UniProtKB/Swiss-Prot annotation:
NCBIfam families: PRK07352.1. HAMAP family: ATP_synth_b_bprime. PANTHER family: ATP SYNTHASE SUBUNIT B, CHLOROPLASTIC. F(1)F(0) ATP synthase produces ATP from ADP in the presence of a proton or sodium gradient. F-type ATPases consist of two structural domains, F(1) containing the extramembraneous catalytic core and F(0) containing the membrane proton channel, linked together by a central stalk and a peripheral stalk. During catalysis, ATP synthesis in the catalytic domain of F(1) is coupled via a rotary mechanism of the central stalk subunits to proton translocation. This is ATP synthase subunit b. Keywords: ATP synthesis, CF(0), Hydrogen ion transport, Ion transport, Membrane, Thylakoid, Transmembrane, Transmembrane helix, Transport.
Length: 160
């Protein structure tokens, strides 16, 4: 195999001219396309950075609002617990007060009933004693002594 070193016969000159012309024409065409693509990519990056910044600001704002809402919810829960405790304590105080009033009423009723029973027993004992004396005395006393005893007993009964 022989190598041909004649530049005109091997089309090296033609190839160099065609490549140079293509390079010169395509440089402007491809350079414009690449420049437009570069500008579009830079614009997309700037838009993405702006959206990221906006999203970050909104996230920070939402987090602060969430923290405030959580604090408010905690305060409401604490206030509710305090209110429930106060209501429970008030209910207990009222229950104790009502129970004390019922106990005092029952004690007063028991005291009144005991007093009434004591008075009734005293009267019955007095009446029984008087009846016994009245049955025994006529045989023991004369009419004058019997009359004095009856008057004395009547006065004692009136004072009792």
């Amino acid at each position: 195999m022989n190598l041909n070193f004649n530049p005109l016969e091997t089309n090296l000159v033609n190839l160099a001219i065609v490549i140079g012309v293509l390079f010169w024409f395509l440089r402007g065409f491809l350079g414009g396309i690449l420049e437009r693509r570069r500008s579009a990519i830079l614009q997309d990056l700037q838009d993405a950075e702006a959206r990221l910044k906006t999203a970050s600001e909104e996230l920070t704002k939402a987090q602060s609002e969430l923290a405030a809402a959580q604090q408010k919810a905690e305060q409401i829960r604490i206030d509710g617990q305090k209110r429930a405790a106060a209501i429970r304590a008030e209910g207990e105080k009222r229950t104790i007060s009502v129970m004390a009033a019922i106990k005092q009423g029952a004690a007063a009723d028991a005291d009144a009933e005991a007093s009434r029973i004591k008075d009734a027993l005293r009267r019955e004992a007095a009446m029984a004693a008087i009846d016994k004396v009245l049955t025994d005395l006529p045989g023991r006393l004369d009419d004058a002594a019997q009359s004095r005893l009856i008057d004395s007993t009547i006065r004692n009964l009136e004072n009792a």
